[in-house]
């Protein structure tokens, strides 16, 4: 079993340090897997995404595909809203292949959109085209078509959700927004409840500004999704 992930795997059970920096560590789950690739094991954090890590592993396994896949980490970074030095380096690598940041962001959103409908079906051919690793001649048209539908679905969901946000501005300056996505969002369609909360949060941030302390809670009968700014 091989695990490639960028989420926190829990506290380090053991760690190896060099010059005051963590260069290796283990966590509880390592007992149950053969290989665990995770930035937290070497003192990193979630800004170095699983998509970037998986691409690097693929390149190590098969160096011949380096140029074919070198734009994928940038897509993963933009899809996860990652920000770190490596992200800018990956964006530069993607630019060498002619991919702008705007187009890479569209690809990330189209991947998210198509993945929702594919779920557990085999969509390798479609995803290869979306990611521009195969059927390159069809890539632009597919992105244009999917992105238009993506924007349409998001707009429809936000029109239902935004009027039903419960807003509170606390004395300490925090803007707290809460919405019952089970009640006030369209069900069984894209975007799903978790994503809907993210889009609602982004709309509030766009209105108030990223420098404001904003917390958004989307909830249902048995779940909750929280988004927040860094302010």
Predicted regions and their residues:
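Interdomain hinge/lid region at the active-site interface
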Residues: 118, 124-150
């Amino acid at each position: 079993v091989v695990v490639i992930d960028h989420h926190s795997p829990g506290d380090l059970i053991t760690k190896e340090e060099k010059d005051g920096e963590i260069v290796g560590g283990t966590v509880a789950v390592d007992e149950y897997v053969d290989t665990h690739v995770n930035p937290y094991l070497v003192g990193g954090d979630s800004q170095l995404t699983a998509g970037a890590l998986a691409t690097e592993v693929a390149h190590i396994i098969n160096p011949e595909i380096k140029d074919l896949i070198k734009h994928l980490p940038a897509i993963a970074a933009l899809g996860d809203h990652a920000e770190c030095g490596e992200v800018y380096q990956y964006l530069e690598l993607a630019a060498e292949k002619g991919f702008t940041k705007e187009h890479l962001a569209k690809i990330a959103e189209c991947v998210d959109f198509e993945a929702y409908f594919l779920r557990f079906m085999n969509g390798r051919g479609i995803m290869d085209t979306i990611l521009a690793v195969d059927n390159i001649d069809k890539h632009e048209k597919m992105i244009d078509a999917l992105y238009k539908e993506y924007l349409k679905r998001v707009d429809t969901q936000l029109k239902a959700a935004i009027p039903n946000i419960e807003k509170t501005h606390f004395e300490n300056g925090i803007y707290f927004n809460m919405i019952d996505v089970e009640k006030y969002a369209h069900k069984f369609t894209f975007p799903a409840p978790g994503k809907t909360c993210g889009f609602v949060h982004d709309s509030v941030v766009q209105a108030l500004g990223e420098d404001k302390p904003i917390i958004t809670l989307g909830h249902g009968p048995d779940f909750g999704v929280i988004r927040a700014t860094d302010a």
